[in-house]
């Protein structure tokens, strides 16, 4: 084994979502960590408040998965920034866990309302800490209220009342979600400095090995339209080939849906409609339908292109793996992966939880979606081998970077067009990350 790496043996607990019972305990293969990853894992284990960051493909999610295997999720819950992410994580949202709701009436009204919630106060006293996933999408005001509520619940003036906080994400990707349209970056709020985060900056891209592509991604992440960026993007511009199987990334949902419908209609096979099976109260099911990336009906045909929506515990696929449907039965779909063998896919359970971690509603469905097109936003976290994208009319900071950084290799990049004005980064984000250069 390489003397510059550490080797850890991890054990995975397999549990049916919502059952509360561990179904089995089994060893998995030893995982060799790079010095950077091993150092990051040591800091995660240290008990300090940690900010785990790095560009796309740097292994943030991988490290958190390893760390979580050592923990009781009741003592250290993982909190998602959006409802859709919470459904895929099998967790709770940041806003629901801290009783923030939609923050109606502003910060003061939200704090007063939440501080009177006895269940919330009890919940914040019981946990050892929280892991906040995709921290870039949490507004600063929400983080500030959550910290104040933690202090009140735990009757302590320590940051977060002594509760541990691990923040994970990349501020150079998608910005915070707010109702005002303002970018309320949480690192600009005073609570960020008070939290005393120890920063881990993962610098090695685990997804891409092409040095030129890595340099281009770095430039785009920093909002730099350098000569090499111009040359690189221009080289990949081509007329749209409707028959090419690569995934299309659109900035808007409606365009992705229409493209998927059109490509499915072109296949001369019988359409198979698989209804999602819901359980829970009617009200909670409606909430799940709005938040979930799982459609009410999965419509497929033999020969259609599909994409996996979640990582497989047995490592047969990851979020973003593509393949072709070769067989469909009531209980199983056989998919021939683009890069590998055929796999049999069973249904998964996806759920929304209340603030206490109890299942409110869940849905059973195959963890698949049509792969002809998706949105840039939904592609975050996915790894693609082939994509088509138009970078001409983007408007959000980080959109171009998220799109380009989905790829393993530049060989799979097809650009319909691009515009320098679409390569955007917030100057405040650039200034924030300068302090970590050299970490």
Swiss-Prot record:
It catalyses: Couples ATP hydrolysis with the unwinding of duplex DNA at the replication fork by translocating in the 5'-3' direction. This creates two antiparallel DNA single strands (ssDNA). The leading ssDNA polymer is the template for DNA polymerase III holoenzyme which synthesizes a continuous strand; ATP + H2O = ADP + phosphate + H(+). Its EC number is 5.6.2.3. Monomer. It comes from Bdellovibrio bacteriovorus (strain ATCC 15356 / DSM 50701 / NCIMB 9529 / HD100). Its cofactor is Mg(2+). Pfam families: PIF1, Pif1_2B_dom. Keywords: ATP-binding, DNA damage, DNA recombination, DNA repair, DNA-binding, Helicase, Hydrolase, Isomerase, Nucleotide-binding. DNA-dependent ATPase and 5'-3' DNA helicase that efficiently unwinds G-quadruplex (G4) DNA structures. May be involved in resolving commom issues that arise during DNA replication, recombination, and repair. The gene is pif1. Belongs to the helicase family. PIF1 subfamily. GO terms for molecular function: ATP binding; ATP hydrolysis activity; DNA binding; DNA helicase activity. SMART domains: AAA. One of its GO terms (biological process) is telomere maintenance. It is an enzyme of class 5 (isomerase). This is ATP-dependent DNA helicase Pif1.
